[in-house]
Swiss-Prot record:
One of its GO terms (biological process) is 'de novo' pyrimidine nucleobase biosynthetic process. InterPro entries: Aldolase_TIM, OMPdecase, OMPdecase_AS, OMPdeCOase_dom, RibuloseP-bd_barrel. PANTHER family: OROTIDINE 5'-PHOSPHATE DECARBOXYLASE (PTHR32119:SF2). It holds the Pfam family OMPdecase. One of its GO terms (cellular component) is cytosol. It catalyses: orotidine 5'-phosphate + H(+) = UMP + CO2. This is Orotidine 5'-phosphate decarboxylase. Transmembrane segments: none annotated. It comes from Sordaria macrospora (strain ATCC MYA-333 / DSM 997 / K(L3346) / K-hell). The gene is URA3. It is an enzyme of class 4 (lyase).
Amino acid sequence: MSTTQQPHWSLQKSFAERVESSSHPLTSYLFRLMEVKQSNLCLSADVEHARELLALADKIGPSIVVLKTHYDLITGWDYHPHTGTGAKLAALARKHGFLIFEDRKFVDIGSTVQKQYTAGTARIVEWAHITNADIHAGEAMVSAMAQAAQKWRERIPYEVKTSVSVGTPVADQFADEEAEDQVDELRKIVPRENSTSKEKDTDGRKGSIVSITTVTQTYEPADSPRLAKTISEGDEAVFPGIEEAPLDRGLLILAQMSSKGCLMDGKYTWECVKAARKNKDFVMGYVAQQNLNGITKEDLAPGYEDGETSTEEEAQADNFIHMTPGCKLPPPGEEAPQGDGLGQQYNTPDNLVNIKGTDIAIVGRGIITASDPPAEAERYRRKAWKAYQDRRERLA
């Protein structure tokens, strides 16, 4: 979006209004989830042990819409596909209503990232709704990951769920001659001992009451979140107010970073934008420091010759979701911190959401190290949501 133009329409619309223009099912779901929970908060759960991760997700889950993980820094990560850490996180996501974002930052040739994403020990695609990629390896890796996700989705095994009911038929079930014939056949195959009657007819023969056995079979993906086999006792609850997340998988492109001295320049960011627009069925949006919807090459990299042209129509159609890390609130009455001394540059929710135009603020240590993490998560949720409301009011 050129600085001389009006703000992109996506900045003026509510999350609910943006659902209709979303090309990705998971993006549509996330927009609706944000409205239901009145939250645009992501927790960066950078803890060191699996027990801490699961406990934190359970405590903070009610306040967030996204949980960001780094599985490879977690001690004690259990890789079992049905009872391991990923499966338990998925159960908590269903219970509290949030999506899991594995901050893997894939960057390699296509065949390698496909295997890293869908195979290996972690099998990220199985439990993480969202992951991300650094596209220094080129746009082809994004297409490769999209193909891998689609193949995974198509080959999810289907499980047969069988229910058996036994009952005594009532009179109106046998209103016609055909039904009577069916009863005669059932009398031949239903064991007498299953009968509920011990009465005898006047001629000395046992009376016979037919029991009909009904077998119903339904088919459901074996990895469907609706199946309870992967969740622990007591975690069967599903967040009310919205259906469970779709099984589709999504990608965030790492377009910009907040670390001091970051080498991701305007040319790189423009290549990210092009890759996102070419892969809308898989790319949900960006991890970025500004809103990139409607952005043009001249906005990001004036004079850059990439041999391609971008149309205004393409730019206007953008409806990508944006997430931004480095969000930090000062203690009440104090000034906002500028950074952590290790290269991380902090921003308040108002600066990120209202001014810079991100959709979801990512918070880590600001919540994790607080004396009361759930209360602090609520403080961040309220601030980030107000920043979103202020943005809409400001740009109306």
